[in-house]
Structures are given as structure tokens and as C-alpha cells.
Amino acid sequence: MLIPKRVKYRRQHRPTRSGISKGGNRVTFGEYGIQALEPAYITNRQIESARIAINRHVKRGGKVWINIFPDRPLTQKPLGVRMGSGKGPVEKWVANVKPGRILFEMSYPDEAMALEALRRAGQKLPCKVRIVKREDQL
């Protein structure tokens, strides 16, 4: 699972989901990529699930890059606990994704298989995504 090795502060305020991605919105490493179309918190489990979906479909011969990292903790108080008495423990780690951000990149010799693998990975993510190619970006 993707989690930070150590953090300066265990609990943070929730990040805002407004605005568009300022950087990381072009395919740079691979030939194809998954681009977010709406804001979302993507957990470390969802990232891992999408990565496994890509690897299971293409098996061998390709390369996958994960361009997001879950570096923000989300806290939650236990069920049935009254308000007050401090902030709850860290429940999960999320990546704050804004529209336009490239989430995964991939290179694979067979284009049809690569696009199908990215489509399957996109179904595991909590936001609308689209598949982009490097040659389409100028």
C-alpha cells in the first residue's frame, strides 16, 4: 500500500477540491494516460486496485507509472462517539486530485490492449476519467 513513511503532523485539515490541476496534466513518461475530469479524493486502496487491473490485463511487456501519491490523511471518529474530545484517528490516506491531472501513464506495444487496460483501471477510480495519448497533446 502507498502511505508516507513519516509525516511532520499526523492529522491535517481536509484539502480543498476546487480549482484545476496546475501541473502534471500532460503525458510525459509513457504513451497513454488516464486523466481525471472531476475533483476527487483517491485512496491508497483505489490506486492499488487500478494498478492491479492494468497489470492483470497486459501481463508482460509494458510499463506503468503512477503519477499520484496518497499523502493526505483523512481522520474519522468511531461510530457512536459524541462530538468533542479531539480529532479522530487517521482512517485512510488520500491523494487530492483536481481536474486535468494525469493519474496513471503506460507504455505498451499493442495500442488496443493498452487502451483496454486503462479503461479497466478507470472503472476502479471514484471520479470520471478519460484516456489520453501522448501524440494528441501538442
UniProtKB/Swiss-Prot annotation:
Bias (Basic residues) ranges: 1-16
Region (Disordered): 1-23
Listed InterPro entries: Ribosomal_uL16, Ribosomal_uL16_bact-type, Ribosomal_uL16_CS, Ribosomal_uL16_dom, Ribosomal_uL16_sf
Pfam families noted in UniProt: Ribosomal_L16
Keyword Cytoplasm: no
GO terms of biological process kind: translation
SUPFAM superfamilies: Ribosomal protein L16p/L10e
GO terms for cellular component: cytosolic large ribosomal subunit
Keyword Cell membrane in annotation: no
Coiled-coil ranges per UniProt: none
Protein name: Large ribosomal subunit protein uL16
